[in-house]
Amino acid sequence: MTKLLMINAHPHTTVPSASLTVAASFKTAYQQTHPHDEITTRDLYQDGVPALNDTTFEAWRKRKYGEELTSVEAELLSRHASWLAEFLAADKIVFVNPMYNHFLPAELKQYLDLTAVARKTFKYTVNGPVGLLPDKHVLHIQAAGGYYHQPDQHNQVEAGDPYLRGMMQLYGIQDYRTIFIEGLDQFPEQREQAITAAQVAAEKLAGEF
């Protein structure tokens, strides 16, 4: 069974989210065109990304030298392993997020740190790193208040999508697609039009993804 993993990296607010709205349209259309696929949604804000902190590094050190872990350390490493296994098991992955200060939300960056594991998602060779996940497919849905992916619209200050694309390339993933919902704050009168256009694009892409 084909597995689709949706990574929601958007805080829960009372203001409707453009990226989550478009992602919902994609999911509905995908379910209709892929009725037998398994869809899992991972909410980074609600679930809490397993930490990469002092406790993590101490637990790794203890495990390396065969020392006994505390219950907190064991639970943390168990969550790391579980989340990584979920990522590895997915055939298709959809990242959904707003753009924060020309980059990704911190929770999504932390998730990428969690999945960047040598000998799992990539390996080191004498010729440099080689990705281990060439058969996966990725879609990135991102919303922004301004324009960053139009001709002459400050493309150089948008670092989030290029970073995500680069990480997927590190993992060996070449099929990487994007849907950008932009200009939402710069031209608020065109907000609904921009969201609707992105929903149409998402529904179309869902059928072939």
Curated annotation (Swiss-Prot):
Q: Gene3D superfamilies attached here?
A: 3.40.50.360
What does the record say about how the cofactor binds?
Binds 1 FMN per subunit.
Could you tell me what reaction this enzyme catalyses? 2 a quinone + NADH + H(+) = 2 a 1,4-benzosemiquinone + NAD(+); N,N-dimethyl-1,4-phenylenediamine + anthranilate + 2 NAD(+) = 2-(4-dimethylaminophenyl)diazenylbenzoate + 2 NADH + 2 H(+)
Q: Which UniProt keywords apply?
A: Flavoprotein, FMN, NAD, Oxidoreductase
InterPro entries xrefs: Flavodoxin_fold, Flavoprotein-like_sf, FMN-dep_NADH:Q_OxRdtase_AzoR1, NADH:quinone_OxRdtase_FMN_depd
- Cofactor entry: FMN
Main EC class the enzyme belongs to: oxidoreductase
Question: Known HAMAP family for this protein?
Answer: Azoreductase_type1
What does the annotation say about its assembly with partners?
Homodimer.
Give the protein name, as stated in the record.
Answer: FMN-dependent NADH:quinone oxidoreductase 2
